[in-house]
């Protein structure tokens, strides 16, 4: 069976010859216990939790972290100095009451995210090709910037299309640049493929929005290749689902 690029990344990072469910759980347990020790030492938000877990099964007895926890105590979840924070992502809550939800990232967090993105994108981004990125570009450590850096590490060329262009402008950019790969949301991709059926796109990864099966099927038919839907979250460093 073919080993995925993400599996290979984890093996290299953890110094493992191979990955099984057993050693994956051992790695997870070890990381959790090291984090719990840091929480105790630094009196972090989770400092009241046990200092050690004997098995992953014990996670079932621990409380969930809620959106309210992030809004009210997000700064207490940071286990490094303020100077070590490279990026803060803020998500406003719905309605007019309640504070914003903030997630903090260090330079090491962003580096891990780029490595994760590069491993995943290597399944469809090839050296020497171009990748059109229809994600927000908001400065150093932004989502678009992290994806672009991952594309460059694969020897490919990122096209920073962003999310503010009209479909007409995006289509013009497609014809001008001729990218082989697309990274962005599913509905804009499908709209572009319908508007310009003869574009250069042959592969795509979609994220940041739900991708219904009917949309996926039509995109795959128009691309002539498998579509890669990805679901991540701010709380897991953008990459982890």
Regions found by a protein language model. Name each.
Residues 117-124, 195:
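Short internal alpha-helix immediately C-terminal to a glycine-rich phosphate-binding loop
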Residues 48-49, 69, 120, 150, ...:
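Residues within well-ordered alpha helices
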Residues 107-120, 130-190:
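AMP-binding/adenylate-forming
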Residues 96-99, 143, 233:
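Gly/Ser/Thr-rich helix-start
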Residues 125-129:
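Short helix-loop-beta connector
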Residues 1-92, 98-112, 119:
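Nucleotide 5′-phosphate-binding alpha/beta core
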Residues 1-30, 34-37, 154-241:
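Active-site glycine/GP-rich loop and adjacent strand/helix microenvironment
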């Amino acid at each position: 069976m073919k080993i995925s690029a993400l599996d290979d990344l984890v093996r290299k990072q953890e110094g493992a010859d191979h990955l099984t469910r057993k050693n994956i759980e051992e790695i997870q347990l070890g990381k959790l216990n090291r984090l719990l020790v840091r929480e105790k030492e630094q009196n972090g938000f989770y400092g009241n939790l046990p200092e050690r877990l004997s098995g992953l099964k014990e996670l079932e007895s621990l409380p969930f972290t809620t959106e309210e926890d992030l809004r009210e105590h997000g700064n207490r979840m940071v286990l490094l100095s303020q100077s070590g924070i490279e990026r803060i992502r803020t998500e406003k809550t719905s309605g007019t009451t309640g504070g914003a939800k903030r997630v903090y990232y260090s330079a090491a967090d962003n580096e891990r995210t780029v490595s994760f993105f590069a491993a995943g994108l290597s399944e469809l981004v090839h050296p020497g090709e171009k990748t059109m990125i229809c994600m927000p570009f908001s400065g150093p450590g932004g989502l678009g910037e992290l994806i672009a850096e991952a594309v460059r590490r694969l020897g490919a060329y990122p096209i920073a299309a962003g999310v503010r262009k009209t479909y007409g402008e995006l289509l013009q950019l497609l014809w001008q640049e001729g990218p082989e790969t697309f990274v962005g949301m599913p509905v804009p991709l499908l709209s572009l493929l319908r508007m310009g059926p003869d574009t250069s796109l042959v592969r795509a990864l979609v994220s940041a929005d739900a991708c219904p099966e009917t949309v996926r099927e039509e995109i795959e038919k128009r691309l002539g290749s498998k579509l890669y839907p990805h679901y991540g979250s701010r709380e897991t460093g953008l990459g982890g689902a």
